[in-house]
């Protein structure tokens, strides 16, 4: 667990208020590491020094033994409960980002877990089998081990609160029996970092999912979304004098499929497949030293982003006019080369449109067409803009789950608003292309909802309610509650929970 002001989204309240949000691309160009971070970094430095003692123990421990140890713990936990309580809930997001290439169905069956694929398409394992056809067995052994480890390490995370609680209790009873873990009480030794192997996994992963034909096809979908945004600018009655500046900003955006441009070079590290933890700690030491060296220095525009291509990750940078889409998105159900163009727009198109829409959220408008932190709207436009989004903030604040309202419009407005604008842009574009029947619109709504579908428990979701990305349920329901067509297609009435009066719906973008 490291402190990283760029990557870690769980900022403190003061930091949040200062920088206006959690979204990574909000970091202003003159943002510097503050000295107040130095104390925390020094604390973590001691933590890593302690871990070097642990490394000595693992120097001669093959990764297979570590994995076997973790697997036994996971099996003991799962087998301790009834079939009903074995319903391990896996969100689509987590599945895409962590289990690429791993035969998870076979693994679940081996653990005797029930209901493992209720809401996930069985197409996934077929795709993974195809990956391994083009990668040699020897080359993928470390990847399989890594992915299996990531799964075992997160078995209880998406289970019931009871299972999650007992998991940690049982887990640490086991670990405390081993003196080696006394150096890091209360912390999962194996959950140190995944970036290094993530980079390696990315290289193998992209061999299958990225080729010139797929890139060209994906860029066609991106251009369709971009042109739809530019065309619909003329429909924004609140936008007048700044229209050309925003159009210019949209036109200059470039795209990066996969993150090879931003991956740091770890070429000096000799990867040892039998010394997993040593690899991780070497990488961690490099990253930690780099953070110390950056204290007091200005953030470079080309150093704002870091991720692994095998995770589902998309982003829009206001500082560089760049969008990034990880290779993990380029697979079913979000994308497949054989899909019709309409299907692609209804699937991966929502992800793309969401990133474009960030240019219109409360943080995106703070940057001008030259990527400087300078309000791009006129004073009159900005005044009208704030009026138009006020109702959406209120809806977020009042949204209830299990009789709770744990959401804050001030934090989550950027993501919900980007979802709303993205949906409206796609709906209008497809209507203009002839998809106007009731069945067409119902299908567009259905595809949008499925983009956020998951089987994660509500209690698990509520733990992340302070994130800038609200719960999947919130993102879908709040968007559709502000879509006029939704009321017509599904005959939504005032007594229905999702009903929002017409005059209270957010009209930041025309229907």
Please annotate each region the language model reported.
Residues 1-230, 260, 282, 287:
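Noncatalytic, helix-rich "gating/capping" subdomain that lines the substrate-entry/channel surface
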Residues 63, 72, 76, 87-105, ...:
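Intrinsically disordered, low-complexity linker/terminal regions across diverse proteins
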């Amino acid at each position: 667990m490291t402190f990283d002001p760029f990557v870690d989204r769980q900022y403190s309240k003061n930091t949040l208020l200062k920088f206006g949000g959690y979204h990574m691309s909000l970091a202003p160009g003159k943002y510097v590491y503050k000295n107040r971070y130095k104390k925390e970094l020094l604390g973590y430095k001691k933590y890593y020094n302690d871990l070097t003692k642990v490394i000595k123990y693992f120097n001669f421990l093959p990764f297979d033994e570590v994995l076997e140890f973790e697997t036994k713990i996971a099996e003991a936990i799962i087998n301790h409960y009834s079939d009903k309580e074995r319903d391990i809930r896996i969100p689509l997001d987590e599945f895409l980002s962590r289990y690429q290439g791993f035969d998870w169905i076979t693994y679940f069956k081996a653990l005797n877990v029930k209901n493992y694929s209720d809401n996930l398409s069985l197409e996934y394992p077929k795709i993974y089998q195809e990956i391994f056809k083009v990668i040699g067995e020897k080359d993928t052994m470390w990847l399989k081990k890594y992915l299996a480890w990531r799964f075992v390490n997160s078995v209880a995370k998406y289970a019931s609160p009871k299972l999650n609680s007992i998991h940690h209790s049982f887990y640490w009873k086991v670990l405390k029996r081993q003196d080696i873990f006394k150096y890091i009480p209360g912390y999962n030794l194996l959950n140190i970092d995944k970036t290094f192997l993530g980079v390696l996994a990315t290289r193998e992963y992209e061999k299958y999912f990225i080729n010139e034909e797929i890139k060209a096809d994906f860029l066609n979908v991106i251009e369709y979304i971009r042109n739809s945004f530019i065309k619909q600018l003329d429909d924004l009655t609140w936008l007048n004098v700044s229209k050309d500046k925003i159009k210019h900003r949209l036109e200059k955006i470039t795209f990066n499929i996969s993150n090879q441009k931003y991956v740091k070079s770890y070429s000096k590290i000799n990867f040892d497949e039998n010394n997993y933890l040593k690899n991780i700690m070497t990488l961690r030491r490099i990253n930690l030293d780099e953070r110390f060296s950056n204290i007091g220095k200005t953030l470079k525009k080309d150093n704002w982003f870091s991720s692994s291509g095998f995770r589902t990750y998309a982003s829009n940078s206001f500082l560089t006019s760049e969008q990034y889409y990880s290779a993990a998105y380029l697979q079913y159900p979000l994308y497949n080369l054989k899909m019709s163009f309409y299907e692609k727009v209804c699937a991966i198109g929502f992800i793309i449109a969401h990133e474009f829409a960030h240019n219109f959220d409360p943080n995106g408008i703070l940057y001008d067409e030259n990527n400087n932190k300078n309000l791009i709207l006129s004073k009159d436009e900005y005044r009208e803009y704030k009026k138009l989004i006020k109702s959406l903030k209120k809806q977020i604040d009042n949204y209830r789950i299990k009789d709770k309202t744990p959401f804050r419009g001030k934090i989550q407005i950027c993501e919900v608003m980007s979802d709303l604008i993205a949906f409206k842009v796609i709906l209008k574009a497809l209507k203009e292309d002839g998809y106007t029947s009731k069945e067409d619109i119902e299908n567009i709504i259905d595809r949008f909802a499925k983009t956020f579908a998951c089987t994660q428990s509500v209690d698990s979701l509520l733990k992340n309610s302070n994130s800038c990305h609200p719960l999947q349920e919130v993102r879908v329901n709040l968007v559709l509650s502000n879509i006029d067509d939704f009321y017509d297609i599904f005959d939504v009435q005032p007594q229905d929970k999702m009903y929002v009066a017409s005059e209270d719906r957010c009209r930041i973008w025309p229907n």
